[in-house]
Structures are given as structure tokens and as C-alpha cells.
Amino acid sequence: MVFERDGSIAGKFRKMHIPDDPAYYEKFYFTPGDQGFEPIKTSVGTLGVLVCWDQWYPEAARLMALRGAEILIYPTAIGWESSDSEDEKQRQLDAWTTVQRGHAIANGLPVVTVNRVGHESDPSGLTNGITFWGSSFVVGPQGEFLYKAPADREVCKVVAVDMKRSEHVRRWWPFLRDRRIDFYSGLTSRFLD
């Protein structure tokens, strides 16, 4: 749910991609959203809200951008499973940050990513649970960091984002204009031969 300044509901988005990997067995509990990728118009701009696992799919970010999103927002709850090595933890965190910075660059839009912090035990007792890595961040339309939150504690921060800059970046790097859509039909196939 996205709320307007006066508390009214501006819109809603249902998570489209549901994970089923170690410590994240969400397919058992959730059904994928069925509303597609529609930005939400608000008094502060048009928001492309994508939830958690949706952040790994460039198609989702691109569809939001093509439909008029002025900023991408990713509310997230991601972390490390207890058996992950320190090297693996760093690789996962780097990949998570990089893919979303890539969405900003490829679409010429700022990205706001908010992530949970803290630890959640595994009620089954099969693992020691998940430690959420925090590290929320805001990047501009060229993927440049405007803010990075700490990994280990909650923070409430107002970050200034120059929304007009996206238009300039899109003129310098007209990725949306120069797409070869006449050759992208394979993107709607699960696999290609």
C-alpha cells in the first residue's frame, strides 16, 4: 500500500515474483500478484513500487519506467542464511546493490531501496535463522549513491532526490529510445532454443 500525504490510499502493488530458495520458502505462503507493473501516481511523483524479490528482475523495473514511473522503490526483507560464509555474504550484498544500481542506470531513474535489519529465528530449527543485512540506500539515475544506511540498525532519513535530473540523464543516455524492440520477442519465452 502507498499512502498519500493526507493518509488516503494512493495505490497498491502486489509482489509479482515469489522466491523459493534456502530460508525464503515464500511460494508455500504467497501467491504472485496479478495486477502487473503499474506505477502509482502520488502528490510527490509517480512511484514504481516493486517488492523484495521483484528487485532481481530488470523486466519489472523496465516496465515501470516505460509506464511512467519517476522513481523506483523497493521495500525489502533480505538477509543471510546462517550457514553462509563471510565471502558468500559479501557477494550476495554486492550483487543486491549492483542489480538495483543497474536498474537506475538502465532506466535513468532514481532508486530507493529499504531493507529490514535484525535477526529472525527459524521456527523449524533447521537453521539458525536469517540475519537481515539492512544497508538501505538511495541512488540517482546514474547509479550514484545519494545515501547508504548502516547494516545493523534502523535509521529514519530524508534524502533529497533531484527528480529533474532523470530527464537530463535520459537525454545523455537515451537507452529507452534506442532499444531494439523488434528483436526482443524472446523475452516473453521461458527458455530459447
Question: Which role fits each region the language model picked out?
Answer:
Residues 6, 12-13, 149:
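Short hydrophobic alpha-helix segments
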Residues 46, 52-156:
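CN hydrolase (nitrilase-like) catalytic-core segments centered on the catalytic cysteine
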Residues 36-70, 76, 166-193:
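Cysteine/selenocysteine-centered motifs that mediate thiol-based redox chemistry or coordinate metal-sulfur cofactors
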Residues 141, 160-163, 187-190:
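Short beta-strand-to-coil "C-cap" segments at the C-terminal boundary of structured domains/repeats
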Residues 3-5, 139-140:
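Short, acidic, Ser/Thr-enriched surface-loop or helix-capping motifs
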